[in-house]
Amino acid sequence: MPKMKTDKGVAKRFKKTANGFKRKQAHLRHILTKKSTKRKRHLRAKCQVAKSDVPAIARQLPYA
């Protein structure tokens, strides 16, 4: 049986942790002048993937 392929786009965006997957938050790439410093600071923090999305990500990362 051939090896399963890892989805490289998903591999670059998500990292496996003991409790699931961590990811970077969105809305921090452009149009930043209208966003407050506080909002941008909070968006820098990593967050957990929702429990309902974990099975889909796990399927795309078979060796994570």
UniProtKB/Swiss-Prot annotation:
InterPro entries: Ribosomal_bL35, Ribosomal_bL35-like, Ribosomal_bL35_CS, Ribosomal_bL35_sf. It holds the Pfam family Ribosomal_L35p. GO terms for cellular component: cytosolic large ribosomal subunit. Keywords: Ribonucleoprotein, Ribosomal protein. GO terms for molecular function: structural constituent of ribosome. GO terms for biological process: translation. It comes from the Bacteria. PANTHER family: 54S RIBOSOMAL PROTEIN BL35M, LARGE RIBOSOMAL SUBUNIT PROTEIN BL35M. Belongs to the bacterial ribosomal protein bL35 family. This is Large ribosomal subunit protein bL35. It comes from Shewanella sediminis (strain HAW-EB3). The lineage of its organism: Bacteria, Pseudomonadati, Pseudomonadota, Gammaproteobacteria, Alteromonadales. The gene is rpmI.
